[in-house]
A protein has these predicted regions:
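Conserved H-loop
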Residues: 109-115, 325, 509
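A conserved mid-domain beta-alpha-beta active-site/ligand-binding segment of alpha/beta enzyme cores
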Residues: 180-182
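Short, surface-exposed amphipathic charged segments that create phosphate/polyanion-binding patches used
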Residues: 14-25, 147-161, 569-573
Length: 585
C-alpha cells in the first residue's frame, strides 16, 4: 500500500513498509530505518485524494501497464450538488481530462443512472476506444431504519401523502430507487395492509395468494409487496376515497414514543429558552432549584430533540448524529437543557483556566530543567534526584507542587446523558419499560481525552459538551480563529466516535460525505434547507451499519425533506455537473 495526500510531486508519496523494495535498516534494531519512496515496484494499492490523483496515476503507470490498473473513485459526486463553482470542480475536471487509466469504477449510492450520464459515457467511449459500460445496482432491506417526523410519528408514503397523484408518483419513484425501501417501517406496513384488506376486496394480495411459500416472505419482498399493494389500491379507488382513507389512517396512527411527561411546562418560542449573550457564552435563562425538571420550560415544537434531558433515553445502542448548519446553536441548546447550574459552569471555567496557567508554568520549568541537566544525559547515576544540585531539586519540587494543583475536570453523572443518575432525574415521571431504558446509550469519555480537550484553545462550549459526551464536527463557526487547535479537537472527537465512546455528534452538512462511523440514530435540523435528494440519501446512509437486530431511527424536523426523498427529481443537479465536469473537451 502507498499513500498520496496533498502531493506536489512523486517525492511526496509515502510507502507502507511492506510495499518498500529499497530501504535502509537500523543497525541497532534491524528494523526499517529509511524507505526509498520513489521505487513503487511492490505497490499494489495506491490511496490518494483528488488533488493528488494525477501524480499517483503517473507513479503507478511507471511500474505497471495501463490495462493492469483499476481507477476506483469513491463518491465521485461529492460537491456536485452545488450549482455554483466549487474548488473541487476544477480538480475533478482536470482529473477526468488527463486520466490515462481506462478501467474506471465510479462508486456511489447516489450515482446518476446511465440515461442521465449520456454525455459522460460518450466522452469515455471516445477517449478509450469504445470502452464497455457496466452498471451494478444493489439495495439492502435486511433491516428497518425508521423515519420519524418532528411530532414523533413514523413516516411512510401512505401516511405522508394525502394527494393521490403524489402517492402514485412516490410508488413509481421507489420502484426505481429501491435503496430507499430500507427506510420504510415494517410494522407500519403490516398495520396498513391489514386495515385496507378489511375494507377492500383484494384477493390477489392476501398473504397466502401473494407469497407462494414461507421462504418468499423476506423483508425485501414484503416492501416490494407494499409498493405493489398501494399501486393496485390506487388503481381501484378515486382520489377522494384515498383522501378519506388517508385521514382515517392518520387518526389511527400512534406516536413512535408514547410515554407520558407529567411535569412538563410548555411555551411558544425557543427565544425564551436560549438567550445568547453577545460574547457567545453560555447563560442560564433562569435559576435552578432542587427539582430542576419541574422548572424546565419546554417548547412543544422541539419535542424529541431534548437529547441532553428528557429525550436522551430514546438514543439506544450506540453513537447518534445531529445534522445542522448551526452547530453552536444546537450545542448551546444541549447545554442549557441539561440544567447544569451556573455555579458548576463557573467552577469548571476557573479550573480550566487554573490548569492552563499551571501547565504553562510546568512546561517552562521542564524546559529549564532540561537545559540545566543536558550535561547529565546518558549518566544514569547522576540523573538520580539526590545527585542534582539544590537549584535543580528546587525546580523539580516546584513542578511537583504545580502538578498537585491540577484539577480533574468532570461533571456529575446527573448531567451526563443516560447515566443512572441522569435517568432517575429525567425518566422518573415516565412509564418507560426497562426493556427500553436498559438499551439507552451512555458516553464513556476517558480521562486522557478530557485532559487533551481541556488543554486546547477551543470554545468553552465545546469543552462542556465533551464532558457530556457530545462532540462537534464543524470548521465554519466565527469563534474558530485558531484552526490548528480545532483540528486537534476534531481528531480526538473522531477517535472517541470511532471507539463508540461518545453519545452524540453535532455536525454540519459538510461532513455528510466524510463520516464513515457507525451511527444508530440521526437527526436532521430544520435549518437544512435546499438539500438535494442525493445528499439526503447519503445522510440517511450514515445510520444502521451495525447489528441487524438493533433499532435504528432517522428523525427529520422538516417535512420538506420527506417530500424531496419520496418524489422523483424535477432536476438532477449532480447529473448536470457530472456531464459538465466529466468532459475531455
Amino acid at each position: 500500500v502507498a499513500f498520496a495526500f496533498g502531493c506536489e510531486s512523486a517525492s511526496d508519496i509515502r510507502l507502507h513498509y511492506f510495499s518498500a523494495k529499497n530501504y535502509e535498516k537500523n543497525t541497532k534494531t534491524g528494523g526499517i530505518y529509511k524507505v526509498d519512496n520513489l521505487n513503487g515496484e511492490k505497490v499494489e494499492i495506491m490511496i490518494c485524494d483528488i488533488a493528488s490523483y494525477l501524480i499517483a496515476m503517473y507513479y503507478m503507470l511507471s511500474f505497471n501497464s495501463e490495462k493492469s490498473l483499476i481507477f476506483y473513485w469513491d463518491e465521485p459526486t461529492i460537491s456536485l450538488d452545488i450549482e455554483t463553482s466549487h474548488p473541487l470542480h476544477l480538480n475533478i475536471n482536470e482529473l477526468w481530462k488527463k486520466n490515462l487509466i481506462s478501467n474506471i469504477i465510479l462508486s456511489s449510492a447516489t450515482l446518476p443512472n446511465e440515461n442521465e450520464l449520456i454525455d459522460v459515457i460518450a466522452d469515455y467511449k471516445y477517449k478509450f476506444d469504445n470502452g464497455e459500460i457496466h452498471t451494478i445496482n444493489s439495495y439492502d432491506c435486511k433491516k428497518t431504519i425508521t423515519l420519524i417526523n418532528s411530532e414523533k410519528y413514523t413516516i411512510l408514503p401512505h401516511l405522508f401523502f394525502e394527494d393521490y397523484n403524489d402517492l402514485l408518483n412516490c410508488v413509481n419513484h421507489l420502484f426505481s430507487n429501491k435503496t430507499i425501501l430500507r427506510y420504510l417501517n415494517l410494522k407500519e406496513i403490516i398495520v396498513f395492509v391489514k386495515y385496507v384488506l378489511t375494507k377492500y376486496d383484494m384477493p390477489m394480495f392476501y398473504i397466502d395468494n401473494y407469497f407462494k411459500n414461507i421462504e418468499n416472505i423476506t423483508m425485501n419482498n414484503i416492501k416490494i409487496y407494499y409498493l405493489e399493494f398501494i399501486a393496485n389500491l390506487l388503481s381501484n379507488i378515486t382520489p377522494d376515497i384515498w383522501k378519506n382513507l388517508h385521514t382515517i389512517l392518520k387518526i389511527q396512527q400512534t406516536q413512535y414514543w408514547i410515554f407520558c411527561d407529567n411535569n412538563i411546562k410548555k411555551i411558544k418560542s425557543m427565544d425564551e429558552i436560549i438567550k445568547p449573550a453577545l460574547n457567545n457564552d453560555i447563560h442560564r435563562a433562569n435559576s435552578l432549584q432542587n427539582n430542576p425538571i419541574q422548572n424546565t420550560i419546554l417548547n412543544t415544537s422541539l419535542e424529541g430533540i431534548y437529547l441532553s434531558s428528557k429525550d436522551a433515553y430514546t438514543l439506544t445502542y450506540g453513537v447518534s448524529i445531529f445534522f445542522t448548519e448551526d452547530v453552536d446553536k444546537i450545542g448551546k441548546f444541549m447545554v442549557l437543557q441539561s440544567n447544569i447550574p451556573s455555579l458548576i459552569l463557573d467552577n469548571i471555567t476557573k479550573n480550566i483556566e487554573n490548569n492552563s496557567k499551571n501547565n504553562k508554568k510546568i512546561e517552562q520549568l521542564n524546559k529549564i530543567f532540561e537545559d540545566k541537566t543536558i550535561n547529565y544525559a546518558g549518566k544514569e547515576r547522576k540523573m538520580e534526584k539526590e545527585f542534582f544540585s539544590r537549584e535543580i531539586q528546587q525546580i523539580l519540587n516546584e513542578i511537583e507542587i504545580l502538578k498537585n494543583k491540577i484539577h480533574v475536570i468532570s461533571l456529575d453523572e446527573q448531567y451526563i446523558p443516560n447515566t443512572q443518575s441522569h435517568k432517575q432525574k429525567w425518566c422518573v415521571s415516565k412509564e418507560i419499560p426497562d426493556s427500553i431504558l436498559n438499551y439507552s446509550f451512555r458516553p464513556t469519555i476517558d480521562e486522557d481525552s478530557v485532559i487533551q480537550i481541556m488543554n486546547l484553545d477551543v470554545h468553552f462550549q465545546r469543552k462542556i459538551l465533551l464532558l457530556m459526551g457530545i462532540g462537534v464536527f464543524s470548521l465554519k463557526t466565527e469563534c474558530e480563529t485558531n484552526l490548528n487547535e480545532y483540528l486537534k479537537y476534531m481528531e480526538i472527537v473522531k477517535s472517541l466516535c470511532n471507539q463508540q465512546k461518545l453519545y452524540l455528534i453535532i455536525a454540519n452538512s459538510d461532513f455528510i460525505y466524510g463520516i464513515n462511523y457507525q451511527f444508530c440514530h440521526s437527526f436532521f435540523g430544520k435549518d437544512l434547507k435546499n438539500m438535494t435528494q442525493q445528499k439526503i440519501i447519503q445522510s440517511l446512509g450514515r445510520v444502521g451499519r451495525g447489528n441487524i437486530q438493533q433499532e435504528y431511527t432517522i428523525r427529520i424536523r422538516d417535512d420538506a425533506i420527506f417530500k424531496t426523498l419520496f418524489l422523483p427529481l424535477q432536476r438532477n443537479i449532480e447529473a448536470e455537473n457530472m456531464c459538465r465536469l466529466f468532459s475531455s473537451v
